[in-house]
Amino acid sequence: MRLALVAVGRLKRGPERELVETYRERADALARGLGFSAVQVTELAESRARRAPDRCAEEGAAILDAVPPGSALVVMDEGGRPVTSLALAEQVGAWRDGGRPGLAIVIGGADGLCESVKRRADLLFAFGAATLPHGLVRVLVLEQLYRVMTILAGHPYHRGAP
C-alpha cells in the first residue's frame, strides 16, 4: 500500500521539519515489513488567488490531482472527528488488507479545504477542537502514522489501552 502525505504549503527548516523527518524515517523503517511503501510527502503551492473561495478551489483541485488513484483518503479537518490511535490502526489495516492501493492523508491550506475534497474523504479526522499550526499538524500526522505502524507490527511503542 502506497503512503502519501499531501499538504498545502511548504514546511520551512526548523524543529517541526526535524520532527517530521524523524517520524517519517521511523515509519519508513517499519513500512516494508507491513506491506506499505515509504511515506511520500507532497508539498503543494499555496494559491495566490485574491479571494478565499478561489484559493480554496485552486488548492482543492491540486490536492485531488495529487492523491494517487484508488487511495483511501484521510482529510485533516477541524470539522472532522477525533479517532483513537488503535481505531486508526484498525482502519488503515482494513484498507490495506482489503486491497486499497494507497492511503493519502491531506492537510489543507490556511483557508481550509473545499467541499469537493471533503466529499471525497473516506475519513474526516481532527486532533481535537483546537486550531493548530500546519507544521505541528504535519508532525502529529507523521507521528500517528508511525504509531499505526507500531500497532500493526505489535511493537511496544504504543502503550495505550488495548
Swiss-Prot record:
Places the protein is found: Cytoplasm
This protein's record includes keyword Isomerase: no
Enzymatic class: transferase
EC number(s) given by UniProt: 2.1.1.177
CDD domains in alphabetical order: RlmH-like
GO cellular component terms, A-Z: cytoplasm
Signal sequence, renumbered to the chain: none
UniProt: S-adenosyl-L-methionine binding residues: 108
GO molecular function: rRNA (pseudouridine-N3-)-methyltransferase activity
Keywords: Cytoplasm, Methyltransferase, rRNA processing, S-adenosyl-L-methionine, Transferase
Main location class: cytoplasm
Reaction equations catalysed: pseudouridine(1915) in 23S rRNA + S-adenosyl-L-methionine = N(3)-methylpseudouridine(1915) in 23S rRNA + S-adenosyl-L-homocysteine + H(+)
A Pfam family it matches: SPOUT_MTase
Similarity remark: Belongs to the RNA methyltransferase RlmH family.
Subunit structure: Homodimer.
Function noted in UniProt: Specifically methylates the pseudouridine at position 1915 (m3Psi1915) in 23S rRNA.
HAMAP family per UniProt: 23SrRNA_methyltr_H
Name of the featured protein: Ribosomal RNA large subunit methyltransferase H
Taxonomic source organism: Methylobacterium nodulans (strain LMG 21967 / CNCM I-2342 / ORS 2060)
